Amino acid sequence: MEHSGTSEVTGADTAGPDPQLAVTMGFTGFGKKARTFDLEAMFEQTRRTAVERSRKTLEAREKEEEMNREKELRKQIEDMEPAPSSSSAARERSQSSCRDTSSSDSESDDSSDSSDDELIGPPLPPKMVGESVTTVDEGTLGPLPPPLCEEGEDDDDDELDDEGEEDNPVQRIPDSHEITLRHGTKTVSALGLDPSGARLVTGGYDYDVKFWDFAGMDASFKAFRSLQPCECHQIKSLQYSNTGDMILVVSGSSQAKVIDRDGFEVMECIKGDQYIVDMANTKGHTAMLHTDSWHPKIKGEFMTCSNDATVRLWEVENPKKQKSVFKPRTMQGKKVIPTTCTYSRDGNLVAAACQNGSIQIWDRNLTVHPKFHYKQAHDPGTDTSCVAFSYDGNVLASRGGDDTLKLWDVRQFNKPLFSASDLPTLFPMTDCCFSPDDKLIVTGTSVQRGCGSGKLVFLERRTFQRVYEIHITDASVVRCLWHPKLNQIMVGTGNGLAKVYYDPNKSQRGAKLCVVKTQRKAKQAETLTQDYIITPHALPMFREPRQRSTRKQLEKDRLDPLKSHKPEPPVAGPGRGGRVGTHGGTLSSYIVKNIALDKTDDSNPREAILRHAKAAEDNPYWVSPAYSKTQPKTMFAQVESDDEESKNEPEWKKRKI
């Protein structure tokens, strides 16, 4: 069989139908020629289509690059020329926006024509588009079309607003609205917010931990759960894990606890042996805890620091022993107590601030010697309340007990970058944190009672100048937290309040979910009263008593000894009816009657003896018969006076007066 120049695929032979086969099978159609496909033509058509699409794409890119060059050139010319009046500048800006809009429309038309085959008619040629643009440039007398000009002006205003917000980070602070959550009457010393921003947990000096659900709360702002996980110990720190399913609780005890989202205990760290000198050989802390921190990358690992001069790493799966121990030391090698600790953003560094004013940073895998050690970061003898890493991980902020806030570069840890003073603090857990964009640093100030109001101070990271302040309440600001997803600020105060600051336009969810809900009305208690059937003509035995007042019913019940449970009066006289009489009826009365009686003998012993003198004289039996012959007459010794006895005594026995 011969083939043509083009390759063809045939489905059957080209011979005609066989009549004998058709008669045998009962139907015709055998031997028809199958459809042929020209593969080379199909490949050629596909190649041409691809080349055409590539050419249009390149032309669109060239047009876009040309427009960008024209914009840059126009901008340079405007910068070189003197500034025109406001009206002409606005007009030129509107005309340029119109040109940009028309050019973008033409490009969109070209792209739509290339992609959509159902559109009828070709797009406008470039010459006509250029003429329309030229007429718009030359016709400065008439107004421009309203829709294009308004949209362009709005876009320019939005761009200017965005540029202003980027230049001034103060405008991003969400403080236009606030809500107040009443925790109690004592200091709110701990705040925690889960990563999604759905639940807030607060702890205070009143030993209580309260859970707040923004989605479930209404305008009454009441906590849905309250508990005391550490009994009679003040809550010092609360922190959600990175997954949000566990909460780390640190109190004044030596054992940290982990609870779940509903407040049920998951694990409790073991207490170490306080009689061992080397704290690295104990299985847990032996003194009061200060603060805690979850590992940012590893699930189930957290860190605690204590008054036993150690920083310990733990795992939730192994509560019987710590994972590793860091022992802060002074430059002389002596023990020093860490007051706060934290992980870096990548979890590779462990930072701790100590009571001698030093800040020590270890590599997480090397527990012996610190990687960085600055010995005079803050005044010795003060408690550094917080250390926090920035979101980029290069800067460390420390809130000292010497009323200062300092900024450090971890890459050059030899001196502070900036230092801000006049920030009083009275609590060992005063916070500091970074804004979500890393451009601001936030901390709170403390005040004495009745001596002013606590403030939330915002400092710019580049210059460390105070750029903004918020007066919170007539008490100290202890805790502060700026959530990056919600863009809301949570503050814990010294008078038992937890405040949430937000902006409806800049914030997401959180407090915005509960402020729009109306407060639920209290449900009235439903009481079922007995239905009375009034039948005035019924017999007295079938009549129901009428309902009386409560006072009269109580008086009647009082007279009934069974309903009033009146005690039985005491039995007078001998007992009756199975009851023993009052006299001698109890054990105490029996003892008083028979044993504790007054048995004093008032008789005269001389008279009792002389009562038998006559009988003894008439009938002597014991002594008198022995002296009847030798001494028939009784003779008694003579009584000597005391003076005679004293005279007969020797001189050395006489009493000296």
Swiss-Prot record:
Domain of life assignment: Eukaryota
Biased composition (Basic and acidic residues): 45-78, 543-568, 647-657
Covalent link (Glycyl lysine isopeptide (Lys-Gly) (interchain with G-Cter in SUMO2)) residue numbers: K299, K593, K599
Keyword Ubl conjugation attributed: yes
Composition skew (Low complexity), residue ranges: 82-105
Region (Disordered): 1-21, 43-172, 543-584, 634-657
Biased composition (Acidic residues): 106-119, 150-168
Protein name from the UniProt record: WD repeat-containing protein 70
WD repeats by residue range: 183-222, 230-271, 284-324, 333-372, 379-418, 424-469, 472-511
Entry keyword annotation includes Repeat: yes
Residue numbers carrying Phosphothreonine: T582
PANTHER family on file: GASTRULATION DEFECTIVE PROTEIN 1-RELATED, WD REPEAT-CONTAINING PROTEIN 70
Modified residues (N6-acetyllysine): K455
Residue list for modification Phosphoserine: S624, S641
Alphabetical list of InterPro entries matching this protein: G-protein_beta_WD-40_rep, WD40/YVTN_repeat-like_dom_sf, WD40_repeat_dom_sf, WD40_rpt, WD_repeat_GAD-1
Compositionally biased intervals (Gly residues): 574-584
Organism annotation: Mus musculus (Mouse)
SUPFAM superfamilies, A to Z: WD40 repeat-like
Alphabetical UniProt keywords: Acetylation, Isopeptide bond, Phosphoprotein, Repeat, Ubl conjugation, WD repeat
